[in-house]
Amino acid sequence: MESTYSTEFIIWARKSQKVAHYYNYDLMKQLNGDKQMTDVWQLPAIGRWEKSCGKHPTQKPLGVLARLIQASTQPGAWILDPFNGSATTGIAANLLGRKYLGLEMEDEFLSMSKARREEIENSTVRNDYLERLAKAKIILPPDNFFVADETDINYGVPWL
């Protein structure tokens, strides 16, 4: 089977050296076979299962966002994505027990985002996503991390 490669550049910046940032070195090392994580990550491309609710022209692989969220936030943290698109960041945030607010101007992509959100509300689909990410060593096995209380999956924020 032939491999195809794509590259995503991620800029990790902050406004000032006075502002602290969070990086979970221990978890990243654990996910990387007990070796310090490098700044070049090789992750699976977008799978068909990630496009079950439609295609977005610049959709990112769920694994990329899951790794970024784990590396840079703690469980329960808020994640803001001002360019929501197909809500991959929101899906990753939700799967990893973070709160999420996404902004999107295009109705087509809002509908896709809502469908993806509804999809992971199904516990079978949610568990499948978590198992796929764990198998790819992007996250720890699902029983090893915090999962948000599903009684209010919207965190009190209305879903439009």
Predicted feature locations:
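PRPP-dependent phosphoribosyltransferase catalytic core
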Residues: 108-160
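Core catalytic lobe of class I
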Residues: 1-112, 157-159
